[in-house]
Amino acid sequence: MADEINEIREEQEQLAPFDPSKKKKKKKVVIQEPVEDLAESSQTEKSDSLPVNDGLESSFTGMKKKKKKPTESSLLNNESVDAGEDLDEIANDEQEGEEGIVLQQRYPWEGSERDYIYDELLGRVFNILRENNPELAGDRRRTVMRPPQVLREGTKKTVFVNFMDLCKTMHRQPDHVMQYLLAELGTSGSLDGQQRLVVKGRFAPKNFEGILRRYITDYVICLGCKSPDTILSKENRLFFLRCEKCGSQRSVAPIKTGFVARVSRRKT
């Protein structure tokens, strides 16, 4: 009977009106941690509170610190830098050496306070001439003249065989050369059919050679550069000698004939 009464009461309580003011109380659940977990948590809190350096020193008090070896990249960079500096120094030394050699060859007085020597200054002038005008400063071309070939024709005439060849070598007109020869020899002559100069009188080859030397000096050679490449022209009754190399121009004296004895008989 008592059990039935209790069941009825419980049903009545369940069917009772809902009261929102009343709240159910939550039961507090207490979890007990083991002792080992508590010790570990306390150690972590202490380690967090300590600075990093102190923790490392306290943990590794009995051990020595090892020095770190330099990496291979740093070594390679240092070697490349040293090699580059060495190459730059070698290149600079070579350039300085070459410049010093060139200056020493051109100007021996560089780097000293001594007086100039005439031979050194003269060599410098010729070096400048060779650089600017290699034709003028080069070796002079010597004009080689063939010796005159002279033959006797009879007892009163002399034949100049290679007269035309010498005129071509000197680049002069045969009439002008013949006029000078006859004026210097003091005789008369003419060209024959073989283009040989036939002169009246007896003359040795030395006579023709000396006259030709004077003709070359007066009417062929340039007095400035001593070049035989000249042109003889006539302007306003005057002869001018112009050099094709240096461009200088000068007037030359006209050919003067001396006294010529009249050998032919006068007509009566």
Swiss-Prot record:
The keyword DNA-binding does not apply. The modification Phosphoserine is found at S42, S80, S112. Residues 1-85 are annotated as: Disordered. GO terms for molecular function: translation initiation factor activity; zinc ion binding. One of its GO terms (cellular component) is eukaryotic translation initiation factor 2 complex. A zinc finger (C4-type) spans 222-246. It is found in: Cytoplasm, Cytosol. SMART domains: eIF2B_5. It holds the Pfam family eIF-5_eIF-2B. InterPro entries: IF2/IF5 (IPR045196), Transl_init_fac_IF2/IF5_dom (IPR002735), Transl_init_fac_IF2/IF5_N (IPR016189), Transl_init_fac_IF2/IF5_Zn-bd (IPR016190). The keyword Methyltransferase does not apply. Phosphorylated at Ser-42, Ser-80 and Ser-112 by CK2. Eukaryotic translation initiation factor 2 eIF2 is a heterotrimeric complex composed of an alpha, a beta and a gamma subunit. Component of the eIF2 complex that functions in the early steps of protein synthesis by forming a ternary complex with GTP and initiator tRNA. This complex binds to a 40S ribosomal subunit, followed by mRNA binding to form a 43S pre-initiation complex (43S PIC). Junction of the 60S ribosomal subunit to form the 80S initiation complex is preceded by hydrolysis of the GTP bound to eIF2 and release of an eIF2-GDP binary complex. In order for eIF2 to recycle and catalyze another round of initiation, the GDP bound to eIF2 must exchange with GTP by way of a reaction catalyzed by eIF2B. This is Eukaryotic translation initiation factor 2 subunit beta. It comes from Arabidopsis thaliana.
